[in-house]
Amino acid sequence: MKDNNKKRKKPLTMMLATRRMVAGQPAPASEEEEAMLTPFQMVVNNFLHDKVAVAGVICFVLIFLCCIVLPFFLPMDKYFQDVTQANVAPGFGMLTPPSGLNGNAQEVSVGSTFSVGIDRDGNVYEWGTFPNEKLKNIPSASEMGKVTQVSAGLDHILAVNEEGKLFTWGNDRMGLEAIPIELRSGADIKQILACYQFSLALTEEGRLYNWGNSYLVNISFPEGVQGNIDKVVANTNLVVALTKDGRVEPLTKKSSAFTQIPEEIQGHVADIAMTDESIAAMTESGQVFVWGNTGKGTLDIPEEIQGHVTALSAGRYNFVALLDDNSMVSWGDNTFQQADVPGVKEEIVSISSGYYGNYAVTESGKVHGWGLKGYLMGTDDLGRDVFRRLLQGGRMTMTVGAIAVIISATIGILVGGVSGYKGGKVDNLLMRFAEIVSSIPFLPFAIILSSILGNRISETQRIIMIMIILGVLSWPGIARLVRGSVLAEREQEFVTAAKALGVKEFGIILRHIMPNIITVIIVNATLDFATCMLTESSLSFIGFGVTEPNPTWGNMLTGSQNAKVIEDYWWRWVFPAITLGICTISINCVGDGLRDAVDPKSNER
């Protein structure tokens, strides 16, 4: 019976011991104020009373969670580049038309990061983020009169008034302002199209005129096409015409996927649209045919729309179809929700698309837009979303810093523990070796090694190399700290008792000494984490760390070396700099708070 009672009491005793360590000794209600705190409770109490340290924890946890969790909801293609979205300022007003237009709209056209529209009175409106200030210089109403058509391009706008006179403003380089002589005095213009660095104008007679960057698109008219054109579409390097007899004619001599037109549709085409990847044609019966490159999903036509399409429009990588039941369907790339069409109850009279935006104009003149609304933190010089890169860069920077700290802490604990416990020649030898490692300058060493290896190693191998070098060269500091703590702890009575019981040296270090100095190690590792993050960022900043296209907070700051970036594109360096600064300061505040919390003297201050 006694043996059974002992077995029952043993787990109960262990549970009580654990409870007392965390919760403290239970005290009577009358003695609550004088209740004793366990060491763990004292550390937690001291830390929670340090408002700066608590604020540091909150800031770091928020940044950490954002960098770890948000990329799952905001994925990023690290190879994505789009010069049409380069250096876009922060904001979400790209698809918000002015109140004076919404409810009285006649036509809307989508540019790269801005839009232009006209109301039923012929007034011109602009909104969005403008690539250059010249776009805001709209010719006066007295000069233009009543405008009947508008078209937005990469960074310029075309307009034509009721007298057939053309107007252009925005970028005036590469001959964009040189309107052909035949059109300057006014003409019977059927369609205008502002494109990527060039402009097009189609007359009612079926003649097409082009001007602008002639090196980008070399237009060549097949026999019998000029003078017989009913509609024209264009992307960044090709112009395609729809003739009055229902034929699709690419205006080029070069053969490509765009020129592989299905023969069965020739002579029966009623409308066309073109993305940067493919061409879509709608026949007189409402059937849709698509051909071109296989990327971005533009060839995947929804089966349910066949036979019901009444109009087509196209953005940079998506198509939009208006159906006979007044609904809209979009397919293709949906990176910026440009394929998520809204439900519109009113009768839709026209649809328009361009780049990453789409609009539907209703019978009452209301404008419904969907697609790219803007960027929270703007874009960089290659059109990449700064916010998404900031999240991915934070994940990379924190990962490099954390693994480097784990490596340095592991080596430092082993070397410092053995050195402090053994003493004598072993201590002397290990500490001299630590001094040799400390004398190696990290940044010059990493730069030289990176220059020597160059492109011989992959980007993944380079990242691993940086983590290993950071960890291997930064352990001496924690090794000295562990050595000093072990030297003090090895003289304690519990260590002598463990030796007397025959506990092995490794067991004494691991089970008896290390638990007593673990708080010191945690504090030092926390401070080293911030240092490693700054070191990695410094290396990436000067081009010897993690390189493009992989983002880190360091290489995102590289552009700040340019005076134009500092002055005009502030968002490219302000947001990464603030995030890195807040993160490292927060970690240092946490480290200082932990150091003060484990210091018994902090209770007296």
Regions found by a protein language model. Name each.
Residues M1-A55, Q106, R595-R605:
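Transmembrane alpha-helical segments of polytopic membrane transport and secretion proteins
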Residues Q25-Q41, G374-F387, S419-G423, F506-G507:
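Short, membrane-interfacial amphipathic segments enriched in basic
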Residues N45-L48, M76-E107, G111, S142, ...:
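Periplasmic/extracellular loop-to-transmembrane helix junction in inner-membrane transport proteins
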Residues V52-F73, I413, G581:
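Short, strongly hydrophobic transmembrane alpha-helices
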Residues L95-P97, G128-E143, F167-S185, G212-V225, ...:
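Short glycine/serine- and acidic-residue-enriched loop/turn motifs that recur at repeat junctions
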Residues F114-G117, E126, H156-A159, T168, ...:
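Conserved core positions of repeat-based scaffolds
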Residues V147-Q149, D188-Q191, N228-T236, V269-D271, ...:
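Repeated scaffold domains used in trafficking and secretory/extracellular systems
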Residues L382-R605:
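Alpha-helical transmembrane segments of integral membrane proteins
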